[in-house]
Amino acid sequence: MSDNEVAHRALDGKRYLLSGPFDLTTPATSVVELAVSGRRCEITAGGPRLGDDVLAALGATGYDEELVYAGGRLAIARTEPYDPQIRLRENRLTGVWLGKRFSFFTHLYGATSNDLLSVLSGFAIREHDDGIAITPHRPHGFAGTATLVKEVPGLGLLEISPLTPQHTAQLPRWRGMTTQAGELFVDELSDGSPYFVLAGSDTWTTVLPLRDTELAEVPRLVGELRLRTAV
């Protein structure tokens, strides 16, 4: 297979370029946590059907409200899922912003539509050809780094984020396998399942093997992956 290339934008505005002899047509999602208006909320962005898919998974049949907002459409749905651990029904509000090519959603609990609008007013929304970027207004801000999640058939699920000093401190003292995308290390999840960590010059990528992943082939496949940030 000849090399393919794709660009994806994380919610913090960072762009990642992936290339190699892989099927890179699968969509990517991005996740980031924000501290806005006294609340911590998680924003998840993806393709135009992401919000609809989330609502279907929650058992909702449609939206309760729809508004024009920030150059797109804001759809609001309310559900009351039952949590068996605490034996209570939760009052959950789901807000979905739909742009021309991308969308994002967030969940708020015990909240009203005005609460959602207050949260959304804490950051600017900008839709690009390769994804959505949000910029918090002061004094609001990101509560963590944004992660880009993309499935690459044959390789696994990639979770990509900027390399931080905290990441560097987690690396073992020995050197990993050198690849064109960075140093590759292998570790185990709590259930004993293997996963891989790829430490690039400015990226940190977790590679989670999927059902079609041949573990013995992962080092070779990662060696054919090129991953970098771009302006």
Residue ranges and their predicted role:
Residues M1-V231:
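Intrinsically disordered, low-complexity prosegments and terminal tails associated
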